[in-house]
């Protein structure tokens, strides 16, 4: 039996299971305080013991959404599993927001944008009727919900991992669309290692556009 502790509002790595079935056990009293990725499912409530069985070659991740640390037990060594996404790889690194002018020149950003939101892990160029969002390799945006607007995403590059409602989509091809209705979970992870291989999304929205309508239910980048 292998164990680890997960502190409040922290997640472990998104991993890919090996050839054996992985059995995860968590105290029953804590199951209501976790979010779980198991293969193509993103489970946020009514988690049961059977949901913690990870089939061979499936992806998995646990997020502690509670207020106390939890103990996670595994029936075999997970250190041999491939790490697809480490949310905290740059936690203690010096962080600088992208410079919009430099980024524009490097990545041939189309003219006509009316606003820019630059962070250290992503940059968004706002046009009159859509946004272009670039996400840094090995990074993801927070798992979030909106209360006053819905969004439509079109994947334009980078083959991201996308959380859309209670489903997870892996290495998504260009031209794929996702609808994110009001009050539904959504997120994007860039699994690429090449520092120039950004994920690119074209985002459109309906409703009231206001960054303050976001609830970030899992926010490893600590951006508010």
Language model feature labels by segment:
Residues 1-19, 55-129, 142, 216-224:
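A short, N-terminal "cap"/entry segment at the start of jelly-roll beta-barrel domains
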Residues 82, 195, 200, 207-224:
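Anionic, Ser/Thr-rich low-complexity intrinsically disordered regions
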Residues 51, 130-134, 152, 177-179:
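Conserved hydrophobic/aromatic beta-strand scaffold that supports enzyme active sites
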Residues 33-60, 125, 164-187:
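Short acidic-glycine-tyrosine-enriched beta hairpin
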Residues 10-45, 49, 137, 147-166:
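Glycine- and acidic-residue-biased ligand/ion/polar-headgroup-sensing regions
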Residues 65, 75, 146, 165-167, ...:
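Surface loops and adjacent helix of pleckstrin homology
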Residues 13-17, 123-124, 133, 141-147, ...:
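Short histidine-centered beta-strand/loop micro-motifs
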Residues 7-11, 57, 136-140, 148, ...:
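Tight coil/turn sites that cap or link beta-strands
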């Amino acid at each position: 039996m292998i164990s680890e502790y997960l502190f409040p509002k922290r997640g472990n790595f998104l991993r890919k299971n090996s050839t054996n079935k992985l059995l995860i056990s968590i105290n029953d009293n804590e199951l209501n305080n976790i979010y779980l990725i198991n293969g193509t499912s993103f489970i946020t409530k009514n988690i049961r013991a059977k949901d913690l069985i990870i089939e061979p070659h499936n992806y998995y991740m646990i997020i502690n959404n509670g207020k106390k640390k939890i103990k996670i037990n595994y029936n075999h060594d997970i250190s041999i599993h491939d790490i697809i996404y480490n949310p905290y790889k740059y936690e203690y690194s010096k962080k600088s927001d992208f410079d919009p002018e430099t980024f524009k020149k490097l990545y041939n950003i189309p003219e006509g944008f009316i606003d820019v939101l630059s962070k250290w892990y992503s940059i968004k160029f706002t046009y009159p009727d859509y946004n272009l969002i670039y996400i840094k390799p090995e990074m993801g945006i927070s798992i979030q919900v909106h209360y006053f607007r819905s969004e439509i995403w079109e994947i334009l590059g980078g083959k991201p991992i996308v959380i859309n409602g209670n489903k997870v989509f892996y290495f998504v091809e260009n031209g794929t669309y996702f609808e994110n209705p009001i009050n539904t979970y959504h997120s994007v992870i860039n699994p690429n290692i090449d520092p120039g291989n950004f994920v690119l999304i074209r985002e459109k929205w309906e409703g009231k556009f206001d960054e303050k309508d976001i609830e970030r239910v899992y926010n490893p980048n600590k951006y508010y």
